[in-house]
Structures are given as C-alpha cells and as structure tokens.
Swiss-Prot record:
RNA-binding component of the eukaryotic translation initiation factor 3 (eIF-3) complex, which is involved in protein synthesis of a specialized repertoire of mRNAs and, together with other initiation factors, stimulates binding of mRNA and methionyl-tRNAi to the 40S ribosome. The eIF-3 complex specifically targets and initiates translation of a subset of mRNAs involved in cell proliferation. Residues 1-94 are annotated as: Sufficient for interaction with HCR1 and TIF32. It comes from Pichia angusta. It holds the Pfam family RRM_1. This is Eukaryotic translation initiation factor 3 subunit B. It comes from the Eukaryota. Belongs to the eIF-3 subunit B family. One of its GO terms (cellular component) is eukaryotic translation initiation factor 3 complex. It is found in: Cytoplasm.
Amino acid sequence: MPEPIAFDESQVDISSIDFSDLEAKYHVPEPEHSYEHFVICDGAPIAPEAKAPVLKKVLTKLFSQCGKVVDMFMPLENGQTKGFLIIELDSAAAADKAVKQLNGKKLDVKHRLAVNKLPDMEKYALNDNISEEFREPAIPEFRSHGYLKSWLLDPNGREQFMLHHHDTVGVYWYKKNIQPEEVIEPRAHWTSASMKFSPKGTYLFSFFPGGVQAWGGERI
C-alpha cells in the first residue's frame, strides 16, 4: 500500500485562483433588517427622570398583553421623559396587535395613547405629498339643525313617545284619550338593536354594530 503524501495547505499560493463563480453560487445574503415589529407610542405621560422606571414598567406590562416586549426606548430631555417611546416586540404580528388594541387607549384621565408601527411613520414622514408648510384648515360654514328641544314648543303641550315593533320604529305625540299622531313617519331598519331617548329627551339614539348615531331637531 503506498504511503500517504504529506500536504501542507499553508504552502499553497491561492492568490491567483478566481473563486468569484463559487462565491456567487454559494453566497448567503445578509438578512434585511425589518422594523415591522417596532411600534411608536405617543401620548405617554411626561414624567421626571426619577419616575421613568416606574412609567416604563407600567407601559411594559400594558404592551406585554400583545406580545413579548424585547426592548423599550424612552428618550429623556431636560431631566424628564418626552411623552413618546419606541417599543420592540417579538414579532410583526404582536406589533399589529398592539396597534389594533392600544391605539387610542386611555392610560388615565389626562393621557390617551397613539400607537403606530414604525414603518408607517417613516412612510408618512418621507411622503412627498405632505407639505411642511402650515395651512390654515378650512372650517365649514355652520348649518343649523333647528331647535333641538322643539318638542317643548308644542302648542298642545304633548309629550313624545317611541314604539319599536319588529324592525320598525316610530315616534308619536301623546295625549290621553286621543289617537297618537306621528311626529315622523315610522322607519324600518332604523336600528339594529334598540333605540333610546337621551335622559332629557333632546336626542334619540340608534344602535349599530359599528357604533351609535344620535338624532335630534325638528326633523329627525
């Protein structure tokens, strides 16, 4: 059996060998860093620096309801927090959940949070359609909806009452021993649940899955 040939790799000059084809074939690209799991929270309390750890603990507990909080950056200026912070969550899904659940949430009586994903903020900030010049907002001309308590001016001194039968709701004038008179023509599908008068009778509320609508004035 032949003896093995001794081979010292350090003695081989590879400077003249072109590996570009192999490098291109087996190149592993660096993963593109994504900010989809980052959110910006505005509207937080402006607190002294000494109370920043307590505030951070409260907000960490709040955002932990949406996913694991990896990191939280709370900038300081002149010895106090600036009212906003950047939160890194463990996934883009957790960031989406944070925006959905916590945007607009009241932290206390004076503070309401505004939560947005970091890429969205960059998208709006880099949008050429957004002007940096302040423009006075156009205020629409006031339109009167009539006297909201016009029913108090009824010459016969009658009260109003509401009837809800199946899908139809009607509002009527009432006076004892007199056939009820329609205030407005009964409407079908005016509400998806019930309807209620406000405590002082100024408004009539209809309820829908998407919210509540108020009705009032001489012509509801």
